[in-house]
């Protein structure tokens, strides 16, 4: 299995990707480095596929990965509820390819190539 190490240990990498997945579900668009965006894409696609399945086991699998954060303060909806209620139904007719990565300029400071990852 090929993956980028992202300059971190395996536990740090898993924590980073969990945070990025949760942020993407909540905000639907985040700016990060290209390498992180490319690593994030397959994980987010799997989460949306779980959301489309919608059964109890899929919900528990998604809840085991996505952080328990409030997505919408007014409705009190958390990230998992948003994934299953808002995002997954939007892609009901789509077979994969739920995200797009847009390259933006290098980051000021260290010149790291940046990208925006968002839902289609």
UniProtKB/Swiss-Prot annotation:
Pfam families according to UniProt:
Ribosomal_L17 (PF01196)
Which family does the UniProt entry place this protein in?
Belongs to the bacterial ribosomal protein bL17 family.
Q: Which HAMAP family match?
A: Ribosomal_bL17
State the GO CC annotations: cytosolic large ribosomal subunit
Name listed for the protein in its UniProt record: Large ribosomal subunit protein bL17
Origin organism is Shouchella clausii (strain KSM-K16)
What are this entry's molecular-function GO terms? structural constituent of ribosome
Gene Ontology annotations of biological process type: translation
Please name the PROSITE patterns in this protein's record.
RIBOSOMAL_L17
- Can you state the subunit structure given in the record? Part of the 50S ribosomal subunit. Contacts protein L32.
Q: Which UniProt keywords apply?
A: Ribonucleoprotein, Ribosomal protein
SUPFAM superfamilies the UniProt entry points to:
Prokaryotic ribosomal protein L17
